[in-house]
Amino acid sequence: SKGCVPATIAIFDGYVRVGLSKGEIDTLGKEGARDFVAKVSRRDIAPILANASLPEPSLRRLKLGATTVSATLLVADMLKIPVFVTGGIGGVHREAETTFDISSDLTELSRAKNTVVICAGVKSILDIGKTLEVLETLGVTTVGYKTDAFPAFFTRDSGFKPSTLVNSAT
């Protein structure tokens, strides 16, 4: 009634697809259970579409890909889709000071110009404080809607605060 159109983004039959049918979503789930679906981040889009330069020979035949937040946001932003909703974003992993394991979701959030992301915060297995620091460094605003608590995916309050609070969507 508000003009919102759900459009699942994925790699399907070797193409970036925006707006999958229920049957296509079911196919992704079933084939994913058989390891026939690639996890596709921003960096993986070109190789999976080229279908030739992936390091693992068995992956060269893959024509299905579940897009991460970074890949989904890249596609949504290119198409000027104004809102992208997801469960949680990636972030800085615990012990990142030695592993340097930081999700490309954070960089992509700083690049998006046409799309905002609505989510339940950072995945709770991550270092939320460090993730918020990286988002601040990258110039990404975090917004709490009717709350001053930053969520931790499964919980409402991570112990951290968003950078901005809003009480109305208008």
Feature-to-residue mapping (PLM):
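Short acidic, glycine/serine/threonine-rich loops at helix termini
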Residues: 18-24, 94-99, 127-131, 153-158
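Glycine-rich nucleotide/cofactor/substrate-binding loop typically near the N-terminus or early
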Residues: 1-54
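Flexible, glycine/proline-enriched loop segments at strand-loop-helix junctions
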Residues: 45-64, 94, 113-125, 159-163
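Acidic, glycine-rich active-site loops and adjacent beta-strand->loop/helix elements
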Residues: 12-16, 88-92, 96, 121-124, ...
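Glycine-rich anion-binding loops and their surrounding alpha/beta cores
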Residues: 114, 118-170
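A glycine- and small-aliphatic-rich helix-loop capping segment at beta-alpha/alpha-beta transitions
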Residues: 23-36, 91-112, 134
